[in-house]
């Protein structure tokens, strides 16, 4: 479990990232060697900085580095203890998640519901069990996930019964599991997404692996079939069909793949791939850190309102800082005006008008 504040670091990987399908022992050795070379280059650069300092200043910086080293040792222990603490509480959460699963899927009934339901439900209406479309609505209420869920995905996601996540140690990372009821779209009862990390504390993604979905004929949601009428005069009178990939939440289970080492990849393609991998990680970490632990709050919309409120407060803080900056600029302008008047001069008209512009115009 993360605190949700980690950001995926893919910088420096570029086109040299090993094949995402599987890292061989040789690939891993090459990756480690590449990282070592990068670190050695950075160390050499740091040495140059130290050598450029005066002896007394250099000595002070060396002592500061020793202090930093002690801090890093403590931080490493913190990460170790945090992982153990998270594992402890994850086990304590499990019974609560099990109760949630049973209520959501109608396995058990909560106290007092049976009699109330009998009194309120019309005789001709079939009584619904559990909480219908619980996970679908929980995810739709999150801004990032709602952009991924297409209208045609919703019918399939109504069959989603539960979402779980597990930390994995070899290799480091985490795994998401999506449990589905029997449905008319695909055979799989469980769809998984696994993230392998080079470093968990400073998350650097090695690769992501998703389940291959076994779609029933004509039910694939990640592709659409286009039918085109044949040209006039053509001997073939049957419509021409063409299959194209389309946007879908279920593309999440087919993560971006890094090309093989021997394939050339230009800078633009590498940047595009990096952005795709970062977005994919954001979706996975959002489900892990926000949706799973606070599912009912996302279902009701409370969590979305809380995030909106936090965003408004952050914006107001930014506006206050901008206003303070503007006041400082105005004060400086007033001082300059006073000086000019003392000297018998006047502020040019153009400058005076510019000083009266709204703050947002100055920032453009």
From Swiss-Prot:
Alphabetical GO biological process terms: double-strand break repair via homologous recombination; nucleosome assembly
Record keyword Lipoprotein present: yes
Gene Ontology molecular function, alphabetical: chromatin binding; histone binding
Acidic residues composition-biased segments: 259-269, 304-340
Database matches in Pfam families: NAP
Domain notes: The acidic domain is probably involved in the interaction with histones.
InterPro entries, A to Z: NAP-like_sf (IPR037231), NAP_family (IPR002164)
Lipidation (S-farnesyl cysteine): 361
Keyword line: Chaperone, Coiled coil, Cytoplasm, Lipoprotein, Methylation, Nucleus, Prenylation
Cysteine methyl ester carried by residues: 361
Residue interval(s) of motif Nuclear export signal: 53-68
Residues of the propeptide: 362-364
Family of the protein in this entry: Belongs to the nucleosome assembly protein (NAP) family.
Lineage: Eukaryota, Viridiplantae, Streptophyta, Embryophyta, Tracheophyta
Coiled coil: 32-86
Short motif (Nuclear localization signal): ranges: 227-232
Cell compartment(s), UniProt: Nucleus; Cytoplasm
Organism: Oryza sativa subsp. japonica
Gene behind the chain: NAP1;2
Protein's name according to its UniProt entry: Nucleosome assembly protein 1;2
Keyword Magnesium (UniProt): no
Primary role: May modulate chromatin structure by regulation of nucleosome assembly/disassembly.
Region (Disordered) residue spans: 250-269, 301-364
GO cellular component terms attached to this protein's record: chromatin; cytoplasm; nucleus
Principal location: nucleus
């Amino acid at each position: 479990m993360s605190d949700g504040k980690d950001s995926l670091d893919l910088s420096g990987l570029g086109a040299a990232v090993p094949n995402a399908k599987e890292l061989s022992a040789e690939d891993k050795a090459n990756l480690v060697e590449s990282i070592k070379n990068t670190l050695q280059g950075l160390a050499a650069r740091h040495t140059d900085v130290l050598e450029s300092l005066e002896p007394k200043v250099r000595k002070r910086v060396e002592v500061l580095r020793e202090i930093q080293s002690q801090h890093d040792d403590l931080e490493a222990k913190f990460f170790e203890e945090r992982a153990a603490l998270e594992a402890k509480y994850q086990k304590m959460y499990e019974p609560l998640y099990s109760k949630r699963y049973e209520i959501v899927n109608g396995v058990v009934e909560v106290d007092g519901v049976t009699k109330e339901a009998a009194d309120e439900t019309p005789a001709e209406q079939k009584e619904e069990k559990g909480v219908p479309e619980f996970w679908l609505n929980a995810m739709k209420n999150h801004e990032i996930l709602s952009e991924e869920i297409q209208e045609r995905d919703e019918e399939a996601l109504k069959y989603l019964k539960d979402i779980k996540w597990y930390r994995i140690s070899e290799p480091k990372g985490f795994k998401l599991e999506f449990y589905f009821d029997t449905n008319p779209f695909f055979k799989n009862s469980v769809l998984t997404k696994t993230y392998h990390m080079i470093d968990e504390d400073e998350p650097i993604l090695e690769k992501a692996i998703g389940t291959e979905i076994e779609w029933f004929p004509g039910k694939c949601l990640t592709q659409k079939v286009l039918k085109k009428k044949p040209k006039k005069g053509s001997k073939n009178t049957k419509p021409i069909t063409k299959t194209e990939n389309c946007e879908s939440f279920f593309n999440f289970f087919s993560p971006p793949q890094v090309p093989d080492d021997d394939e050339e990849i230009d800078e633009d393609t590498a940047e595009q791939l990096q952005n795709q991998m970062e977005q994919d990680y954001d979706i996975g970490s959002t489900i892990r850190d926000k949706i799973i632990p606070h599912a009912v709050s996302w279902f009701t919309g409370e969590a979305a309102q809380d995030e909106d409120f936090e965003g408004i407060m952050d914006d107001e803080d930014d506006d206050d800082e901008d206003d303070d900056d503007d006041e400082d600029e105005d004060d400086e302008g007033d001082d300059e005006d006073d000086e000019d008047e003392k000297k018998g001069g006047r502020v040019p008209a153009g400058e005076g008008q510019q000083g009266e512009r709204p703050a947002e115009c100055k920032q453009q």
